[in-house]
Amino acid sequence: MNASENYFTMDPTENISQVLDQNRNNTNSLRTHPTVEEYYENMTAFLSLAIFIASLLTILNISIFATTVSRLRRHLDKPLLGPSIMMVGLYPIISVAALVTILVPYSWFICHTVMHVMFMVGGPVFRTLLFRYVGSEQNYVKETAGEAVQLNTPPCCCCCLCLPMVIPTKAKLCISRYMVWQMPFWQGSIMLVMNILYYRDIQLYRQVMFFFIPFIVCSIVLGAWSLQITVRMITKVRGDYQLRKKMFCLQLVVMLCKLQYLVLYDQLDGIKMGGEYPINHTVYKQTIINILILVEMVLVSMMVQSAYRTPVQVQIDEVNKEKEVTRI
């Protein structure tokens, strides 16, 4: 009996199981990340060029950060200096995470978590910076004399139209603070669990990952809503500090590193790239996405540099005016 006769005499269920196993193996070979040794032993010209470009973009981003920090240290007061440096430092950290993902593809989920953490950390720091622009929460309440604030701001501008205007008090500002500070604790715990599942049991991770998404989305929406309300409050007092531009730069972390990442991760599956394991489709796909993020982080860093010129420039103008008055 030859091989063809053996094939036709096999149980049909065995044929189906073999086909399914083969398809599963093909899928795994496309999705599996290579080890560091396999990655560099099979390096291609495209990946070498990508690493070179990614390194240059990361160095450029760090240079922009150093220039911005140098300017801030010369002109900002100490209460504003720390939070301002932390805010402009989010973007070079994201660039380093994207570079590490290209250098070590297997570390992509940890690096993606680092990008996510930047928004979780940036939210509370930015809120602290906002109230330091006016001294403190108590000073804001005194300075505005109980002026009411609207709650229908993005991302809840449509569903909160029925909510009345609120007069800021110590208790209500405390609630706003908790809405922002829940992000690092709540999302940090979820991302820690997801990292453990991904690197310990990836099959279990793929089964349960969708159950975590609603909790992460709700946490981000609550934090962003509270920050938008706070920006609107402080803008009435410090309208020349470009607070909306600073908030937009922070939101770009989520938009570019989270939403864009997830969208492109699925969309690029329709384009055939790479070959068989180890330099497979997933490696090419992640390299392209992270190169795009690196380019965007350079542009965002330039925008951040422009946004954080104030209150530096405002303080310089005030000093110049005082000098002119004393001369007169």
Curated annotation (Swiss-Prot):
The organism's superkingdom is given as: Eukaryota
InterPro entries (UniProt xref): Ostalpha/TMEM184C
Organism equals Drosophila melanogaster (Fruit fly)
Q: Name one Pfam family in it.
A: Solute_trans_a
Tell me if Cell wall biogenesis/degradation is a UniProt keyword of this record: no
Taken from the record's topology, the Cytoplasmic segments are: 66-84, 128-177, 230-247, 309-328
| Purpose | Probable transporter.
Question: By what name is this protein known?
Answer: Organic solute transporter alpha-like protein
List the lineage, top down: Eukaryota, Metazoa, Ecdysozoa, Arthropoda, Hexapoda
Main location as per UniProt = membrane
Transmembrane region positions? 45-65, 85-105, 107-127, 178-198, 209-229, 248-265, 288-308
What are the coiled-coil residue ranges? none
Q: Where in the cell is it found?
A: Cell membrane
Membrane topology per the entry is: Multi-pass membrane protein
- GO CC, alphabetical: membrane; plasma membrane
The alphabetized UniProt keywords are: Cell membrane, Glycoprotein, Membrane, Transmembrane, Transmembrane helix, Transport
Keyword Glycoprotein: yes or no?
Answer: yes
Q: Indicate the family of this protein.
A: Belongs to the OST-alpha family.
Membrane topology (Extracellular): 1-44, 106, 199-208, 266-287
Q: Which residues are glycosylated?
A: N2, N15, N25, N42, N280
